[in-house]
């Protein structure tokens, strides 16, 4: 289950 991308961590 993939966790949502953290808003403060760029891709």
From Swiss-Prot:
Record PTM Pyrrolidone carboxylic acid, positions in chain: 1
GO biological process: regulation of blood pressure
GO molecular function terms attached to this record: peptidase inhibitor activity; toxin activity
UniProt note on tissues of expression: Expressed by the venom gland.
UniProtKB keywords: Hypotensive agent, Metalloenzyme inhibitor, Metalloprotease inhibitor, Protease inhibitor, Pyrrolidone carboxylic acid, Secreted, Toxin
GO CC terms, sorted: extracellular region
S-S pairs: none
Principal subcellular localization: secreted
Similarity annotation: Belongs to the bradykinin-potentiating peptide family.
Protein name stated in the entry: Bradykinin-potentiating peptide 11g
């Amino acid at each position: 289950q993939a966790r949502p991308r953290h808003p403060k961590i760029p891709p």
